[in-house]
Structures are given as structure tokens and as C-alpha cells.
Amino acid sequence: MDLQFLGTSSGVPTKARNVSATAVIEATGHGWYLVDCGEGTQHQLLRSPLSMRDLRAIFITHVHGDHCFGLPGLLASAGMSGRKAPLPLIMPTALHDWVRQGLAASDTYLPFELQLQALETFDGFTCGNIQVGKVELSHRVPSYGFVFDEQDPEPRLDTARLQADGVPAGPLWGQLARGMTVEHEGRQLDPQHYLQPQRPPQRIIVCGDNDRPELLAELAKGVDVLVHESTFTEPVVERAQATFGHSTAAAVARFAEAAQVPNLVLTHFSARYQGAGAARGSSIEDVREEALAHYRGNLVLAQDLQRYHLARDGRLVEVL
């Protein structure tokens, strides 16, 4: 799977960072899922190769505006782009009427079915070989993370088993490879009996705002990539004597190290953290240095519009 970050700033945008939005992209490179939709997300999409027609579902982690204010515009643009397929939108119940009323008040017509689902009672979503679950987090308001699990990735035909079962090479093999049930000599052949994954399935967790990384302990077992907010560094929290429901780079890094997370992506940075080499104020390098002091795995500080690929060897790498 791939990740592309459409917004990595906390609270407000900066000149270099938009507010929260993350795309999780299927291994095929086409279908994708949007986690959060801060204001301006549709503008970021114009600067990416992602198509609204290939969007499988939208997931909103919590009600705060920097995670959802981009929804009405994005939905309207999806309709104007010619999308016809139904679009599942999983988000807190408190936002449902806001979206409905916003579309109605602006006389916005959607040529597709908007399938609103309550996040509080959400019990999973499946599309093709991707399953999405949720995990409850800790913030000033109810907040969740989403777990993306692959099932049977990149299956290949078990030709030895086919031959042993007397199924000759030919069109039947092609149909089974495409996941079709076929009939041979009066028998129904289930494609799942003849398909094997070429690599281990991948798991990616994308979190909303959270001040208790340890809540992820169980789900982090076997995770390939953890995407977690890192709004502040410890000196900022110490001066303020409050976390405001957010995590520091050190807190997330300590958890990821203890949980043996192989790839840690930090995002949702306070606007105070400017680019490397900033003339004044805090630098994003402060976040990196604090995390590296506690974490020995592959650390990534998310950048707007940067795409990352989870390779076969399990390492998350930039797509150049």
C-alpha cells in the first residue's frame, strides 16, 4: 500500500502545510481511502494524481474543524467531476446534519449516493481485499484511528495444486486467477482454494488526535506503519503545563520503540514548527531530533503531497 499526505498541519494551515488529510492507496495504485478532510483538501488533490472517481470511502476521525471543514467542497467537486458510484462517509454522528444542511443550503446536487455512517457504531468496512477497522483514542472530544488491513495481497495461482486436481492449463486457470468460480468435470472450483498471496499482508494505522499512544498497544502488534500525530515537543508542553489532548514527539516515539513499530510517520505538526533552517521560532527538526532520541526504527516526518510506498521488504520509502 501507499500513503500520500494532503495535509500535515495542526489547527491552522501554514504556507507549507495544509490541515489534516491522508490518502491510503491500494497496492494496485488506483483505489484509495481518505482519512480526514481539512479545509482545502480538494485543492491538494489537484496537485496529486488521485482521482475522485477512485475514492473508495472517507473516514473522519473526530469533529474538530481542521479534520472536516473541507468536506462540503470536496463532495461538491466529486459530483462535478462526474462521479456516479456511491460514496461511504464514516464520521461522528454530530457532523451528519452539518454535511446534509450545508449541501442543501448551498443547493448542491450530488449525482451519487452519499452513504453516511455513524463512526460511533462503525463495525468495519470491506472493499476488495482491504478491510478497515477503528480504534478508540483519547482527545478532548471522542477521537478514533483507522486500521487498514490487506487480505490475500497479490494472489497467484497454485499451479501445482491445479495440476494435482486434474485441471488443465487454459481458460479455466485465467478465470480462477481473476477470482471467478468455475466448473470443471461437474465440480465447482472455488478460486480461494487455488490462490496464494505472494507476500505477507500489510497493516497501516492512521490515527486522529490522541494524547495516549499506549491505547494502540494491541493493534500495533504486527503493524507495518503507524501514522500518528506529533503536535508538540516536550519543551512546549512543559512550558504550557498542558497537552491540550495531543501527543509529543517523544511520547509517540517511546511507544513506537516499545511496540517495535518498524515504520513511524509523524504528522499534525503545530504551526509553530517551521521548515528546517527557519530564521526564528521552532524548527520541524526539533520534532525529528526529539523522536530520534527515543525511536530506532524508520522515522518519517510527513510532508504535504509527499507519497510513500510500503515496499515488499516492509520499509516505507519515498516515491520520487
Swiss-Prot record:
CDD domains named in the record: RNaseZ_ZiPD-like_MBL-fold
EC number(s) stated in the UniProt entry for this protein: 3.1.26.11
Binding-site list for Zn(2+) 2: D66, H67, D209, H268
MF (Gene Ontology): 3'-tRNA processing endoribonuclease activity; zinc ion binding
Reaction(s) catalysed by this chain's protein: Endonucleolytic cleavage of RNA, removing extra 3' nucleotides from tRNA precursor, generating 3' termini of tRNAs. A 3'-hydroxy group is left at the tRNA terminus and a 5'-phosphoryl group is left at the trailer molecule
The keyword Zinc is annotated on this UniProt entry: yes
Cofactor annotation remark: Binds 2 Zn(2+) ions.
Protein keywords: Endonuclease, Hydrolase, Metal-binding, Nuclease, tRNA processing, Zinc
Binding-site positions, Zn(2+) 1: H62, H64, H139, D209
Cofactors: Zn(2+)
Active-site residue numbers: D66
Protein family (similarity comment): Belongs to the RNase Z family.
PANTHER family to which the protein is assigned, alphabetical: ZINC PHOSPHODIESTERASE ELAC PROTEIN 1
Task of the protein: Zinc phosphodiesterase, which displays some tRNA 3'-processing endonuclease activity. Probably involved in tRNA maturation, by removing a 3'-trailer from precursor tRNA.
Alphabetical list of NCBIfam families matching this protein: PRK00055.1-3
Record text on subunit structure and interactions: Homodimer.
Protein's name in the database: Ribonuclease Z
Species the sequence originates in: Pseudomonas entomophila (strain L48)
